[in-house]
């Protein structure tokens, strides 16, 4: 199925994992203490694709799911949200990945994953829908797909094909340390593709992890700059975000809400940003316009924290604009 959102809009193709998050029905308890869980579709790249589509953009997802009930359910959720699913493969031998999420009382999360191996890890380069990837105006990805072969080779091939076709490359490492063999391997692989990206978004926690510096300031952020980068973003949770280009840098405050679950907030932020720039990359060169885009992205991220689960909480364009209007009033 192809996306039905405006065919004249540029396509955002998101590559990587899609999985089921099991979110506890109460906050502030351990997994063993939780009395029940809500089944919530997730996976950062898939979240970004749906975030773009919810906001009226065109999005596609490339990845691999298990040929099981959960896998077909997830593909159906993409279709229901007008995300092109022609880049999906199904694996008959491996299951769809699962993650059990512990919600702290402040809405922050801890994860326990079931995926050794899961279907997303088994995507091969020869299974890629290259025609779909070549049609991307923006190609977005994370780092979880770099952890093991054959998915790592598929990731590298997809990135290369998208770049050669003229796509803007967007990278959100989305660090999940328990999935990596060691912190050192995580840093090495995350940084191995760093200089390929045009846009990079990291959280304050990821900035500290990658640099080894506990001080979150401009100097620390700029240590991750590379010459071909167009935009570096550092998200700071309730403190908004910082932005860096070759010509200017600054910060944009976020909106204070009663956070229930921070799952998907960063993906909502990224989706909003990509949807705003996919057809007009000159935004990246004009600070005032970029600040407006980032304010909108911050609003989308904030809205996403007010509900449990990532995908159910991603806002529509109307919801985000209504939220911003209330903030002004």
From Swiss-Prot:
GO biological process, one term: fructose metabolic process
EC number: 2.7.1.4
Catalytic activity: D-fructose + ATP = D-fructose 6-phosphate + ADP + H(+)
Keywords: ATP-binding, Carbohydrate metabolism, Kinase, Nucleotide-binding, Transferase
Highest taxon of the lineage: Eukaryota
Main enzyme class: transferase
Molecular functions (GO terms): ATP binding; fructokinase activity
Pathway: Glycan biosynthesis; starch biosynthesis
A GO cellular component annotation in the UniProt record: cytosol
Ribonucleoprotein listed as a keyword: no
Family indicated by similarity: Belongs to the carbohydrate kinase PfkB family.
Function: May play an important role in maintaining the flux of carbon towards starch formation.
Name under which the protein is recorded: Probable fructokinase-2
UniProt lineage: Eukaryota, Viridiplantae, Streptophyta, Embryophyta, Tracheophyta
């Amino acid at each position: 199925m192809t996306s039905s959102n405006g065919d004249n809009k540029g396509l955002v193709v998101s590559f990587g994992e899609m999985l089921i998050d099991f979110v506890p029905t109460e906050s502030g308890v351990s997994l063993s203490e939780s009395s029940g869980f809500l089944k919530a579709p997730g996976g950062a790249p898939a979240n970004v694709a749906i975030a773009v589509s919810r906001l009226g953009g065109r999005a596609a997802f490339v990845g691999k799911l298990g040929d099981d009930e959960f896998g077909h359910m997830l593909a159906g959720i993409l279709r229901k949200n007008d995300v092109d699913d022609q880049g999906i493969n199904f694996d008959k031998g491996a299951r769809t990945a699962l993650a059990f999420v512990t919600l702290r009382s402040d809405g922050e999360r801890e994860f326990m994953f079931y995926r050794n191996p899961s279907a997303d890890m088994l995507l091969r380069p020869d299974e890629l829908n290259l025609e779909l990837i070549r049609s991307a105006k923006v190609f977005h990805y994370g780092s979880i797909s770099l952890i093991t072969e054959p998915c790592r080779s598929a990731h590298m091939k997809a990135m290369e094909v998208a770049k050669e076709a003229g796509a803007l490359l967007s990278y959100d490492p989305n660090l999940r340390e328990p999935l990596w063999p060691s912190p050192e391997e995580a840093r090495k692989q995350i940084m191995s593709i760093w200089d390929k990206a045009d846009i990079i978004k990291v959280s304050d926690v990821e900035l500290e992890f990658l640099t080894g510096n506990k001080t979150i300031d401009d100097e620390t952020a700029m240590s991750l700059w590379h010459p071909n980068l167009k935009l570096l973003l550092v998200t700071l949770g309730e403190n908004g975000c910082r932005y860096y280009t070759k010509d200017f840098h600054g910060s944009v405050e976020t909106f204070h809400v009663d956070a229930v679950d921070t799952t998907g907030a960063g993906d909502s932020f990224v989706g909003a940003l990509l949807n705003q720039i996919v057809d007009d990359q000159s935004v990246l060169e004009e600070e005032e316009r970029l600040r407006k885009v980032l304010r909108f992205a911050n609003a989308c991220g904030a809205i996403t924290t007010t509900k449990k689960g990532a995908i159910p909480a991603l806002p529509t364009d109307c919801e985000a604009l209504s939220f911003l209007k209330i903030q002004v009033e």
